[in-house]
Amino acid sequence: MIHPGTRGDTAVAPLSSRSGHRKKKDPTSVGAWPALFIGPLMLGIAVFYYWPIFENVVASLKQTNAFGGNPQFVGFENYRELFASPDLRSAIGNTLLYTVIVLLGIPLSVAVAAMIELPGLRFKGLYRILYFMPYLAMPMAVAQVWKIVYNGQFGLLNQILRSVGVSDPPCWLVSPGWALFAVALFGLWASIGFNVIILSAGLKSIPRELYEAASIDGASAWRQFRMVTVPLLSPSIFFLTIMTTIGGFQLFDALYAMIGTGNPAEPRTRSLVSLFYRQAFVNHDQGLGAAVAIVIFALVAIVTLAQFLGQKRWVNYV
């Protein structure tokens, strides 16, 4: 006969031994949750970003005729033809000039945002909306409006110039010397709204105590702007510099809407993306067009990397 206490002991013993071998869960372990959340995003990036880049690199090493067919591997012949062409140098120069002019809108946006955020100013929200509204409009539609403004005969700009004594104002969008400058002014104007919103948010994050301390020390309003506002606003300025530079290298829609293809100024205003469009879809040389796309990608990567390396000298992260 088995004693009841013995049965109880035999029942408890395995539980105690089993619990002794149980592994304690690491409180810092998160398991597979990061992979579950990041995995779909990384898969989408690989499919929609990295794979097209790889396919474009492969296409740039091949020669395809206008009617398709079997592409022929030509190695770096497309790149040799591209770098020997004066069209590439002209397109790079036009793209850089446009980008530099549009970048001038950032200090202008800093001034506008600083005026909007002045203490005691009423209707700040209304001013932000008014500056941001052009950014919400369709770029092609706004470009058509500016095309009318730039019209050489009855455009608003030339009417104003004639009223102040300029007897022979230029035909802005037809003259090769003025067309790119006119498009760049449109790009500068179009960037103001987005810039002001970003900079206004940055200005609102600056503690007011810093201005009060600077005022007690006798700093003027201009010195406060230079020594307090600009350094603490530098992360927002750096972000806008990156975004504006990338947008400048992607110039196409404004040129296409305002200059067109039959304009005598078109060859002098052709950007890198315009050159890509012309080679790939007008001349039907997809291999050369792919080579232009790779050059654009490389230039944007180099310029962006240089900006990130240089930002350590002037960007202040508090």
Regions found by a protein language model. Give the residues of each.
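Short, Lys/Arg-rich, polar N-terminal cytosolic tail immediately upstream
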Residues: 1-28
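A structural signal for multi-pass alpha-helical bundles of membrane permease subunits
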Residues: 30-318
